[in-house]
Amino acid sequence: MEMRVQDYGADIKLMDTSFAYIDGTFQAELPAGDVYVEMTKGFEYEAVRKKLRIESNQRELKLEISRFTDNRSKGWVTADTHVHFISPSTAILEGQAEGLNLINLLAAQWGDLFTNVGDIPQGPLTSRDGETVVQVGTENRQHILGHLCLLGGRAEPVYPMSAGGPQESYLGDALWNSLADWSDTCRERGGLVITAHFPYPAAEVGAGIVLGKTDALELYPDFGEEFNNLRFLYWYRVLNCGYRLPVVAGTDKMAAWIPVGANRTYAHLGQQEFTFDNWAKAIRSGNTFMTSGPLLFFHADSRAPGEEITLGAGGGAVEVQAEARSFVPFHRVEIVLNGRVVASREERDGVREMTLREKVQVNGPGWLAARCFSKVGLTTSWDLKVLAHTSPVYVQVPRQDLFSESGAAFLMTLIEGAQTWVETLATRPDAERLHRIRKMLSDARDRLHQRMHEHGIHH
């Protein structure tokens, strides 16, 4: 199996340009004369690109980079939920250089190869200033049912790390585990369960959502135009069925052609101490946003993402506010209600700051969120677009339940597809394990089927 990995040092190649990660000091041989320097430090600093004059006898050079906002001082923690193939100490250096507070470094199985497993028993590694932490978890993978980021969990790997599937488990390996089994084990240890690179692979994703086996969905800004992207559209379908799942983001970094935190999560801890457990609690509470550049903050009737608004019968007007700042220009901010744009503001030439305030009419139960988009183009070889999206503020209306027929049909298709695959194509394990997997999928189907009938949807 071909593996394109980074396990040799701290450098990065963005498109055709190579960079080095440094801790604030470095030595380099430079020619006398004009040279160009480029510096970045994540999403809260002004990027620098300028020409310098190097004198023939010069031995020292001082370079400065300025911070235009400090969200850590406002109670926010920024994290990459999904990183592979670097050592914890290298992850600390790269995380500090990218302005990250938390890197979730994931051990994984790749056929006969196991990576970063030996880093798990030592527990988290913390930078000297206490502001950057590397937490080693696992990515547990099944090539049809799906992948999970299992974070935290008392520094114990969740075995088996893969179950069936070429390039994931052993050749010819049986379906020993479902994603639900892995999720339950991680949660029993106090860990956080994230559906990796939602929704692919997709088969058990629907069952996991219906049974409440996942804490958040990891989204990538890659496919499609702007938010016309199946990752976001499928998330909207899930939300429209009343399943409250916040958004997170990670890079799935596997080599030096993508920086840690190029796609990242912001979570609001407020006055709580920065620990992994408090970060996981903040993720579950839902005050998060994912971003590949812009910093996006949202309130609806002064409620933050993850919180509820209760309206009277028939709904009412809700005052929404979105604020965005970015180290690169962006062009539009939007408010979405149940996935539909209900307010927007656009600057055709691009801006670095924008605020959108509106009153929107909400006639029934649902959710509100903010999103913003830049037209500056792709930022990495993984085709990441520049955008941000908040988790929702939820709207309650008496005696009405949020449920979507098309969303339910989507989830049911996933569940029934998983059942068909297990029965016809999967390499079967022993009878007891097979029964447990069958029962899990059957329970998910029955639960969704019951909700559909409660809403007059015949299936």
Predicted region positions:
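Catalytic cores of extracellular degradative/oxidative enzymes
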Residues: K74-V247, T251, W257, F276
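C-terminal functional module detector
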Residues: M1-E29, D34-D70, P201-A203, Y236, ...
